[in-house]
Design a protein with these regions (language model features):
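Amphipathic alpha-helical segments at domain termini/boundaries
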Residues: 1-27, 175-209, 217-226, 254, ...
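Conserved CoA-thioester-binding segment of acyl-CoA-metabolizing enzymes
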Residues: 1-62, 100
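Glycine- (often His-adjacent) and acidic-residue-rich active-site loop
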Residues: 63-101, 147, 230
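Terminal peptide-recognition signature
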Residues: 24, 28, 43, 61, ...
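Helix-loop "lid/cap" segments that line or gate small-molecule binding pockets
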Residues: 170-171, 222-226, 240-246
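Short, active-site-adjacent cap segments at secondary-structure transitions
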Residues: 66-70, 117-119, 140, 223
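Crotonase-fold acyl-CoA enzyme core
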Residues: 101-214, 247-248, 253, 262
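Charged catalytic carboxylate motif
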Residues: 38, 42, 94, 101, ...
Length: 269
């Protein structure tokens, strides 16, 4: 197995590529992977590198250690970074850039969750296409206990997943929800025992990585357009991507492999 590590400016993030999977790790375990501003800056670099590398078929993000995915923003930085209008503007710009990097990623993104997934950590997990949590996962948005405001953009995905009633309970109570509760409300795709988490994520990532990249890309794009307001949908972009699938070498390979009763070897072209 070939492993390629990305050199990053911060020790609080790690990134590597192995077997067609890009792994992005939030590496601040002493603070339960609380998100520092420099970690948001690194997200832009990491996802940009994964997007540009044809060897990466799918991306998995995870927290270091066994206590947390991301426990939220690093509140110890608030005084330095968010106590003035200028500081908040800078912080918001960095966070917005990370958000754009997530939205620009055309490859499937899986969130692998253990332990705390709170506040900004839950917002980060909601950027994923698929969320798999161990049964020790804990979820919350404690903004109401911190005096923070959440805008429409920050709540759009949450409401689309769990509906307005559960979104209200999450936001207004600021309480913690168990992994079982998160699964029942549709906040996560799957809840598995702690011991089964690695295998479940590895299996799913491998399945996606083995599929035709152009088809996977087109499917992700189409689903993203479906959940938009009708007047904001870019249907022409999706149609172009679908046509690219039918014109691809992989379409020929897929049909040939089916007829020959073998596994296809897709190239992404």
């Amino acid at each position: 197995m070939t492993v390629t590590e990305l050199a990053l400016a911060t020790p609080y993030m790690k990134a590597e590529i192995r077997d067609g999977v890009g792994w992005m790790t939030f590496n601040n375990p002493e603070r339960r992977n609380a998100m520092k501003m420099e970690m948001n800056e690194a997200i832009v670099e990491i996802l940009g590198a994964f997007q540009a590398d044809d060897a990466v078929r799918v991306v998995v993000m995870q927290g270091a250690g066994d206590r947390a995915f991301v426990s939220g923003a690093d509140i110890s930085e608030f005084e330095a970074n968010r106590s003035t209008p200028e500081g908040r503007e800078r912080f918001d710009a960095v966070a917005a850039a990370a958000g754009r990097a997530f939205k620009s990623l055309e490859k499937p993104l899986i969130a692998k969750i253990r332990g705390f997934c709170m506040g900004g950590g839950l917002a980060t997990a909601l950027q994923a296409d698929i969320r798999i949590t161990a049964d020790d996962g804990q979820f919350a948005i404690p903004a109401a206990r911190l005096g923070l405001g959440y805008g429409v953009a920050g709540l759009q995905v949450l409401v689309s997943l769990v509906g307005p009633a559960m979104a209200n309970e999450i936001m207004l109570s600021a309480r913690r929800f168990t992994a079982a509760e998160a699964g029942a409300m549709g906040l996560v795709n799957r809840v598995v025992p702690v011991a089964a988490l690695d295998g479940a994520v590895d299996e799913l990532a491998g399945q996606i990585a083995a599929n035709a990249p152009l088809t996977v890309k087109a499917a992700k794009a189409a689903i993203a357009e479906v959940v938009k307001d009708p007047e904001r949908r870019d249907l022409a972009r999706v149609e172009h991507m679908i046509e690219a699938c039918f014109q691809s070498e992989d379409y020929i390979e897929g049909r040939r492999a089916f007829m020959e009763k073998r596994q296809p070897e897709f190239k992404g072209r």
